[in-house]
Amino acid sequence: KGGLMNQNKLFMESLVGIFTANQGKIKLLLMRKKSEPYKGYWVLPGEFLKIDESLEENVSRVINQLGLPDMYFEQVNTFSDVSHYEKSRVVATSYLALVDIMTLKLKQEERKVEMEWFDINEIPKLGYDHNLIVSELIKTLKQRIINSNILKILFPSDFALPELQKIYESVLN
C-alpha cells in the first residue's frame, strides 16, 4: 500500500547555538561528532524531535543533556535543504541560546562528548551545513545586540563596563 505518508518520512531536529561572553569575546559551544557521517567534525548541539515533544521541549532537553542551566533561547530559522542530511530527509530548526559564563557547569564527563567553546570569529569547518546555520545565528545575535538589551543575559550583575565594550567591539568588528 505505501501511500504518501509512508513515502514522505521526515525527521525534525533542533540545533542550538549556545553563546556566552568570556574575556571580552563572544563564544559558541560546539561538540565533536563521534560517528559517521562527519566523524571528528565539530557540530552544533542538537537532537531529533520526539513524537511527543514540542520544539521548545526538545531544545530544553538538549540544554539539559549538556548539563547546562536553564537559559534564554529563541527560534531563529528553519533549514529544509534536501541535502541537509545525506540519507534521510531532515528539517532543522535553529535556536539562539544565551548563558552567563558564571552559571556554566558543563557535565562533559557525564555525557561522554567532547565539547569546546569557540570564539565566534574563529569558527572551524563544521559538519553538515552547520557553518551556514552558525552564520545565521551570529547574524541574528549581532542584530539583537544592536537593537535590544540582550547582552544583559550574558553577564553577571557585577560585570565591568570595559568588558561590555570589548564584547561590542568583538561582535560588531
Where are these regions (language model features)?
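NUDIX/MutT-family hydrolases
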Residues: L96, L106-L141, L154-Q165
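N-terminal strand-loop-strand
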Residues: M5-W42
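Short helix-coil junctions and helix-kink-helix linkers
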Residues: K166-N173
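Active-site segment of metal-dependent pyrophosphate-handling enzymes
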Residues: N6, L10-S14, K27, E56-S60, ...
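Short, compositionally biased serine/threonine- and acidic-rich segments at solvent-exposed termini, linkers
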Residues: G46-E47
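Conserved helix-adjacent loop modules within structured domains
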Residues: N147-D158, V171
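A eukaryotic nuclear recognition-module signature that targets compact all-alpha binding cores
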Residues: P37-W42, I138-I150, L161
